[in-house]
Design a protein with these regions (language model features):
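Membrane-embedded helix-loop-helix hairpins and adjacent transmembrane boundary segments
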Residues: 1-632
Length: 632
């Protein structure tokens, strides 16, 4: 589905202009303040709305608006069980860590999570270790965010002849940097997004990130609620959607090439992605654009999906399917491991699965994921940083209530919207991460307001951007503060720190951009892996460090190390040894659960095998509160 006019593009450009304007205003805001505190924490001045929306917008990343919708689209209603505990994670994160982190960060002057660990355990080594681990995992986490944004840009601009020509020219000019197997329109969209987000993050700092998070938080919830209304209307109501889904069978996934009887004419032949075509009585849909280059007779293999449900085939072909300018040749088709030929699998757990005969979400795994999101969300360093930047306990209490409501208004509607997407946009199962922008166009055009697609697309774009800017800034702050200032040049001037921060932010953006040149099929798997890894590495050391006086440096190192080793090993066995996309789950429990338990055990063993902390540290972290500190 592509735009039929420029109205959605104009709306999207206006949104982007507002984001850049906020960065410019923010840059002026911190010129007369301490650079590090303002650039990386906004001078610790977050109020209720700012705290709730920057916390929520950062948490609601590409996983919420690309990976999560793609899994709903692929597996159906079982995703409601999968995401359920995300509604309570703000209570866990803000309630358990918020007050203590705020007090301690002000006492110690800490700006980053490694800052807290260095002050608590009097260990520069631990701070460097945590910085390195955070930087690696967050750089990996950024790849899905960049991928989603590039897919949105491709969907928004892909029908423009100028955009198509520039994309092809870019790949011709930079063949060494851009893989020839990559879709040039995707690559061009990726570079446009990277330029936008890196420029405004570098220029505006934490305050720009918070201001844009507030804007993006409103855009996200408004976009989701509008999509919910349009989706329910266009499928004829939830009862009708449920009845249709109960009759659906999972599709079959395969590849195809397209041939000509004679060489292609000048400029070649292009068949758009999402094009329907028939081979005999079988119905297929392309999931990638087809290019037959000038002077050639055959395209490269592209992904196609075969529709298997009889009523879907009848409905789609009722008005006829257009003839293709080339002949399709199907190379292979793969049935689902669970659900192939079965009706109703989208309506009940464990849901259909292309690779797992047990389905997507067996009961034990559903229980495991209820613990997963509460732990993973609480253990994210990006959330901890925001808990170091609010104004007082009253702000924290109100933000918790606001954020729980905010997540309810996003995640449950998303389940409904993208179950409806199986009826409104069938046949995208090979590239399900594109379902969000595709649905934005389908719903806005179906509602007779095509310009609204630009606003609806801004919701997932905002989710990716709000996560990217926060994570880039957090990596940059840890590198500048914990590596450069603390270990290399303690007497660095404000000017030097500013330019080192700018350069680091730019470098991180470049790394994530190159990583996104090879996008995975399911973004959510990367997000789950890296999000879980961050929680395993940081939740136990930080929580034990701020609440347990006996906890010491050896305990923190063993906690972090043993947790990550166990967590990574379970993924390694699944990914490499068993050649499976999913990790090994002993007793049906996710690796995060085992990693977190190992982290707690490692922390306990390391603590009691070595000595206690210094009196100075105990006084600083567990003594009387500062007279001016609001902890009421």
């Amino acid at each position: 589905m592509t735009p039929t006019d420029n109205s959605s593009l104009i709306a999207f450009i206006c949104y982007t202009a507002v984001v850049l304007a906020l960065a410019v205003i923010s840059n002026y805001a911190f010129k007369k303040r301490s650079f590090l505190s303002e650039y990386f924490l906004g001078s610790r001045g977050l109020g209720v709305i700012a705290l709730a929306l920057t916390f929520g917008a950062t948490s609601a990343s590409a996983g919420s608006f690309a990976g999560f919708p793609s899994l709903i689209y692929a597996h159906g209603w079982s995703l409601a069980l999968w995401i359920a505990s995300y509604m309570i994670f703000p209570i866990c994160s803000m309630g358990i860590l918020g007050k203590r982190l705020s007090v301690i960060s002000q006492r110690t002057g800490a700006i980053t999570v490694p800052d807290i660990l260095r002050e608590r355990f009097e260990s520069r080594t631990l701070a460097l270790l945590s910085t390195s681990l955070m930087a690696i995992l967050l750089c990996v986490y950024l790849v899905p965010q960049f991928t989603l944004a590039a897919l949105i840009m491709q969907q928004l601009l892909g029908s423009s002849p100028i955009y198509q020509e520039l994309a092809i020219q870019l790949q011709t000019v930079l063949p060494e940097l851009i893989p020839q197997t990559a879709n040039p329109e995707y690559v061009f969209g990726l570079l446009l997004f990277a330029l936008l987000v890196v420029v405004y993050t570098t220029f505006g700092g934490f305050r720009a990130v918070v201001w844009t998070d507030i804007l993006q938080g409103f855009v996200m919830v408004i976009g989701v609620l509008l999509m919910l209304i349009f989706a329910i209307i266009q499928v004829g109501g939830l009862p009708n959607a449920s009845s249709a889904m109960s009759s659906m069978q999972p599709p079959r996934l395969g590849t195809a090439s397209f041939n000509l009887d004679m060489p292609a004419p000048p400029n070649g032949i292009r068949i758009d992605s999402e094009t329907w075509f028939m081979l005999g009585d079988d119905l297929y849909r392309t999931n990638e654009a087809v290019h037959i280059l000038e002077g050639t007779q055959e395209s490269a293999s592209v992904k196609v999906t075969q529709i298997m449900t009889p009523f879907e085939i009848d409905r789609i072909t009722a008005d006829g399917v257009a003839e293709l300018p080339a002949t399709a040749v199907i190379h292979e088709l793969t049935p689902y491991a669970r659900g192939d030929g079965q009706s109703g699998t989208y309506m009940k757990p464990p849901g259909p699965s292309p690779s797992d005969p047990n389905g997507f979400l067996p009961l034990g795994l559903a229980v495991s994921f209820f613990a997963f999101w509460a732990l993973a969300g609480t253990g994210q360093p990006s959330n901890m940083v925001r808990l170091m930047a609010f104004t007082g306990t009253r702000t924290l209490r109100r933000a918790i209530a606001s954020l729980v409501t905010y997540f309810l208004m996003i995640y449950f509607p998303l389940v409904i919207i993208f179950c409806c997407a199986r009826l409104l946009a069938p046949g995208l199962d090979h590239t399900p991460d594109r379902i969000m922008p595709v649905m934005a166009y389908i719903l806005s055009e179906g509602a007779g307001v095509p310009w609204l697609a630009g606003i609806l697309i801004a919701a997932p774009f905002a989710a990716a951007m709000s996560t990217v800017d926060s994570f880039i800034l957090m990596i940059s702050s840890s590198v500048v503060r914990d590596v450069y200032q603390q270990s290399i040049h303690p007497c660095a001037s404000q000017r030097s720190l500013k330019w080192i921060s700018y350069g680091t932010t730019l470098l991180i953006g470049l790394i994530a951009t190159f990583g996104a040149l090879y996008p995975p099929q399911f973004l959510q798997y990367i997000i789950v892996f890296t999000g879980g890894g961050l929680a395993v590495a940081f939740l136990a050391p930080v929580a034990l460090g701020i609440y347990w006086p006996r906890f010491n440096k050896s305990g923190a190192i063993m906690s972090m190390g043993l947790g990550i080793i166990v967590y990574a090993l379970l993924y390694l066995i699944g990914f490499i040894i068993l050649n499976d996309i999913t990790p090994v789950r002993p007793l049906g429990l996710d690796p995060l659960i085992w990693g977190f338990l190992a982290s707690l055990i490692g922390g306990w063993i390391g603590t009691y095998l070595t000595g206690s902390n210094s009196e100075e540290v105990l006084e600083k972290f567990f003594g009387k509160p500062l007279p001016t500190q609001d902890i009421s």
